[in-house]
């Protein structure tokens, strides 16, 4: 049996839809249940940010998670396949009236993704003070907490509604299929079989 960690929300639904196509059967969580066993799979409904931990620690053999989360957590997992679901971008946002001035002695950047942010500005040799927030990132430049933000952008509507614009794109992200390294050895045939079936559906 393969244990599969899925993120709550739209990505889980779209991933289960892929399984439904592969096995010609309905894969669906019952209301409020966090686990589902079906056709030699156990599915776990997990917070997106926790999936790399579940897979790294072996609580799940494989998982589906955004590339941005993988890069932020820098987890020791195998990246098997880009599922091309949940496409988005990690962007730098600033006020409409501002420009991003890389020559400032230190830029203050508010974000939920401190590691991606730190690595990006270090690669540009720009001094940045990272301000870790857990929500309402768009407020930070408006109230003077930061010069800019780093956040996930899907359509850009939230930024526009809050008087912000995209100043730069750090990376593009989409959901990836990942595997625990030990599981890939002990359950190699099962994982590769599933990999090929998923690949044939999405490509």
Curated annotation (Swiss-Prot):
Keywords: Amino-acid biosynthesis, ATP-binding, Cytoplasm, Glycosyltransferase, Histidine biosynthesis, Nucleotide-binding, Transferase. GO terms for molecular function: ATP binding; ATP phosphoribosyltransferase activity. It is found in: Cytoplasm. NCBIfam families: hisG (TIGR00070). Its EC number is 2.4.2.17. One of its GO terms (cellular component) is cytoplasm. Pfam families: HisG. Lacks the C-terminal regulatory region which is replaced by HisZ. The gene is hisG. Catalyzes the condensation of ATP and 5-phosphoribose 1-diphosphate to form N'-(5'-phosphoribosyl)-ATP (PR-ATP). Has a crucial role in the pathway because the rate of histidine biosynthesis seems to be controlled primarily by regulation of HisG enzymatic activity. Pathway: Amino-acid biosynthesis; L-histidine biosynthesis; L-histidine from 5-phospho-alpha-D-ribose 1-diphosphate: step 1/9. It comes from Campylobacter fetus subsp. fetus (strain 82-40). Gene3D superfamilies: Periplasmic binding protein-like II (3.40.190.10). InterPro entries: ATP_PRibTrfase_cat, ATP_PRibTrfase_CS, ATP_PRibTrfase_HisG, ATP_PRibTrfase_HisG_short. This is ATP phosphoribosyltransferase. GO terms for biological process: L-histidine biosynthetic process. It catalyses: 1-(5-phospho-beta-D-ribosyl)-ATP + diphosphate = 5-phospho-alpha-D-ribose 1-diphosphate + ATP. Heteromultimer composed of HisG and HisZ subunits.
């Amino acid at each position: 049996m393969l244990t599969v960690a899925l993120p709550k929300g739209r990505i889980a639904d779209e991933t289960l839809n892929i399984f439904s196509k592969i096995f010609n059967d309905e894969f669906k969580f019952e209301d409020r249940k966090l686990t589902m066993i079906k056709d030699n799979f156990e599915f776990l409904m997990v917070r997106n940010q926790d999936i790399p931990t579940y897979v790294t620690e072996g609580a799940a053999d494989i998982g589906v998670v955004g590339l941005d989360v993988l890069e932020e957590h820098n987890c020791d997992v195998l990246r098997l396949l880009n599922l091309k679901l949940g496409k988005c971008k990690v962007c730098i946002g600033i006020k409409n009236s501002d420009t991003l001035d890389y020559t400032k002695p230190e830029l203050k950047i508010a974000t939920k993704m401190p590691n991606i942010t730190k690595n990006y500005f270090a690669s540009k040799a720009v001094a940045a003070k990272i301000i870790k927030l857990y929500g309402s990132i768009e407020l930070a430049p408006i109230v003077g907490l930061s010069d800019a933000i780093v956040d996930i952008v899907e359509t850009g509507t939230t930024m526009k509604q809050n008087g912000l614009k995209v100043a730069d794109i750090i990376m593009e992200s989409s959901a990836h299929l990942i595997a625990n390294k030990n599981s890939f050895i002990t359950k190699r045939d099962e994982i590769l079989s599933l990999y090929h079936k998923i690949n044939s559906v999405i490509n």
